[in-house]
């Protein structure tokens, strides 16, 4: 009897109750693949290129079919166009079951943002921490545009930091039905379209705004714009 009990105890103990989930990210501009120095157009008709595109993701949670919100342990990921490895985010510890949505923050939460420079993905070596202005850059887009009035026609949008009411983290929720099973790792493929930075509720004209690198109203509005840049990639 004791041996039988031990057998089933070991069997239950070895049964997985959680599994990993992989998020992959593809970058586009106006539904076209993002390519360095390729010319794109805003909805306002401005031509522009992108030379740098990166953003922080954190505070992941998943919503089950019964509307239970499963929050994962805090992790911070820096996704960058020039790093293929960064476009694959592996999240662990998600309980087995059926889910209908994923939620995450674009940026770094207030606790880490106000603690100062960190290590790992938050290491200042990645150029996403303002040493002269407390806080992290939540998202960065750089490039060029003939419409830019600065001498080299550059575009520099560094959105982040804290100053009074100006906080640029944005929460995203995407409907993405999937199943977490013990025998298989779920994969969710996401697309980030950089055109939304300039084509959202607040249209950006490069002749008027060719960059922004401090907390403020313009940064808030661009963050509102790019909070809509993510979608689930259709199969």
Segments from the language model and where they lie:
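A short, solvent-exposed, low-complexity linear motif enriched for acidic/polar residues
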Residues: 19-235
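Bacterial Sec-dependent N-terminal signal peptides
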Residues: 1-23
